[in-house]
């Protein structure tokens, strides 16, 4: 099981195949995604990689966090996340994971925080049908109707779909296809929509419900500080 990466959502665009078909894609950018720590079975009870991405001013950072990045010899990161991996998929601390960690054509699972919509009614939040437009209905056309129950059970059950805050939920979208990668600019283009707003942090990992391509690098594609990574084409077409 390989590590995922931390990326930022840039926005959506489209790419064209050789046959003229256009594919809507979401552009994800790797902002110097580095390994900042290991989690081992002996010390932590599980095996994982701790990754960091982006940059952060140390003046606003707790002393304990500054020490953690100092030990790893990496610059302070704005976003930190853990990815469970197998023993043979550990990547050295300080290594930077590159965009061609994923290969064109493979499927990935992406996780992000959805756009906040504020307080929403039942029709917008849960796709309720609402009440009738006429025939005695006044003012309550968009209400949810009955919340269920009479004297027995005499209450509204927990988790009943009702109006309330909508959005800002942690959502995972499965099986998005990698269309292109740009190693020089650190870009990954995936087919379809990705949850979250522009600039939001996205976790990208190998799809759990699809087989991993044989050409996918193991334990991953990365470069260690002071070393040159293997040369790769700037853009790989996935027609």
Curated annotation (Swiss-Prot):
GO biological-process terms attached to the record: translation
Residues covered by region (Disordered): 140-166, 211-239
Keywords for the protein's UniProt record, in alphabetical order: Methylation, Ribonucleoprotein, Ribosomal protein, RNA-binding, rRNA-binding
PTM-bearing positions, type N5-methylglutamine: 151
GO CC, alphabetical: cytosolic large ribosomal subunit
Annotated signal peptide: none
Post-translational modification note: Methylated by PrmB.
Function: One of the primary rRNA binding proteins, it binds directly near the 3'-end of the 23S rRNA, where it nucleates assembly of the 50S subunit.
PANTHER family for this protein: 50S RIBOSOMAL PROTEIN L3 (PTHR11229), LARGE RIBOSOMAL SUBUNIT PROTEIN UL3C (PTHR11229:SF16)
Alphabetized HAMAP family for the sequence: Ribosomal_uL3_B (MF_01325_B)
Record text on subunit structure and interactions: Part of the 50S ribosomal subunit. Forms a cluster with proteins L14 and L19.
Protein's UniProt name: Large ribosomal subunit protein uL3
Gene that encodes the chain: rplC
